[in-house]
């Protein structure tokens, strides 16, 4: 019974992905480059672009999130789907927002990543989208109880959470947050040049369209630079 149920879920997911791809089947290079989206309204530009180093030619989309965020769950889903559909052209990475005064999200996120518990991290993002629930789980003892309910080894979690490696990753997260000028969340950076915030990310169709526009714009800029 479980086999057939799993098979059905797999088939449904494949159909959903094919439908989404069909709706999005205009190739990125065929999207017309025109001023249908405006800087300062639909997206924002860095005055000084941040250098992005990648081994391949794909455009980097960086998503900054916080566990105390009602919109971040939807943003994560939107970007995951966009990344799947456009896997040849873009790569999506996610980072926790961190300041010296707010270590919670970064330390918890990197601890769960170290434990290969990405699914639990996703569940926590959904769980803490409610402000009241976030305040509860932001207390370490309550978080450990919740993690135990998710079958996470809390002793190992605590050991990793307090490790030097996680402290180092937290410091890197603080630097990254400051370097990218993250002032809200969700905060999505495209190739170190353009930024999307909740004013765009609240709607999946809107987000897809603006991303297509910016990815096409960046691709054109690269081609023109190579021709010079």
What are these regions (language model features)?
Residues 70-148:
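Structural alpha/beta surface segment adjacent to cysteine/selenocysteine redox centers
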Residues 149-228:
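C-terminal cap of thioredoxin/glutaredoxin-like
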Residues 67, 96, 131, 158-161, ...:
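Conserved short-loop catalytic and cofactor-binding motifs
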Residues 26, 53-56, 69-71, 108, ...:
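A broad, low-specificity signal for short, low-complexity segments enriched in glycine/proline
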Residues 1-5:
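Positively charged n-region of N-terminal signal peptides that target proteins for export
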Residues 6, 19-101, 174, 216-228:
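Extracytoplasmic thiol/disulfide redox context detector
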Residues 7-16:
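Bacterial N-terminal signal peptides
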């Amino acid at each position: 019974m479980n086999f057939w149920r799993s098979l059905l879920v797999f088939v449904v997911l494949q159909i959903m992905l094919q439908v989404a791809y069909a709706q999005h089947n205009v190739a990125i290079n065929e999207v017309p480059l025109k001023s249908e989206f405006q800087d300062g309204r639909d997206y924002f530009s860095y005055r000084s672009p941040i250098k992005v180093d990648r081994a391949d030619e794909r455009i980097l989309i960086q998503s900054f999130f916080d566990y105390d965020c009602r919109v971040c769950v939807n943003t994560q889903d939107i970007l995951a789907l966009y990344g799947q559909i456009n896997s040849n052209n873009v790569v999506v990475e996610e980072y926790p927002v961190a300041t010296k005064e707010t270590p919670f999200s970064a330390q918890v996120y990197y601890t769960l990543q170290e434990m290969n518990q990405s699914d639990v991290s996703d569940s926590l993002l959904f769980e803490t989208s409610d402000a009241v629930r976030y305040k509860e789980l932001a207390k370490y003892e309550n978080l450990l109880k919740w993690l135990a309910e998710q079958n996470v080894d809390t002793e190992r979690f605590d050991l990793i959470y307090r490790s030097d490696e996680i402290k180092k990753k937290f410091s890197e997260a603080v630097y990254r947050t400051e370097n990218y000028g993250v002032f809200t969340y969700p905060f999505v950076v495209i190739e170190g040049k353009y930024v999307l915030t909740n004013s765009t990310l609240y709607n999946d169709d809107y987000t897809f369209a603006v991303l297509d526009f910016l990815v096409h714009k960046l691709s054109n800029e690269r081609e023109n630079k190579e021709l010079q």
